[in-house]
Amino acid sequence: MKFKLKDPGSAITHGIAFLLAAVGAAPLLIRSSEWSDHIHIVALGVFILTMMLLYAASTLYHSVDSTAKVNRRLKKLDHMMIFVMIAGSYTPVCLIVLHNKIGYVLCALVWATAILGIVFKAFWVTCPKWISSVLYIGMGWLCVLAFMPIIHALPKAGFGWLLAGGIIYTIGGVIYALKLPIFNAKHKNFGSHEIFHVFIMLGSACHFIVMYCFVANMPI
């Protein structure tokens, strides 16, 4: 029996993203292990692991077309991992860049929000896309609570990449919410959802650059 991808465009884009994240994991962890403390390798390990989990879950969901029950569970996992990756992206910023009471409180807040998001998706994975986008974008911008400390702690270039990633993620979330039906009608395997995937990949790339080039080198 020939295997056929359920959503080829979505499966391929995030399959590529998973491979890129896996390739980037080793150099990131090697660089973070140069410090004598364990905070660098733990925080950056959480960052890259949660990124890989998101892309693995997304690739699996968009690749496999099984029973309605299995598909629903895979969809829940896919959506839940978005909250997990957002929290994972915050972790190095909170524990390394800030490394103070503000950072610890923000880290606890984003992970608590991630848990609430996971519970929400467990019970209402079919909620309107705009609700999902509001939740993801809102969680992503919790950093405004510590905006000035982050600006002062990161080099200008590092903050620029961090901000660029946040903006790109936000644009992707808006595209996800709008769905762009006219575009979808013209491109069967590469519609608004796949464009959303590309924006998520670009946002991840920006944040990987921040972590590898700036955060991994920061003393605490």
Model-identified regions with their sequence ranges:
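Multi-pass alpha-helical transmembrane bundles in non-GPCR membrane proteins
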Residues: 1-220
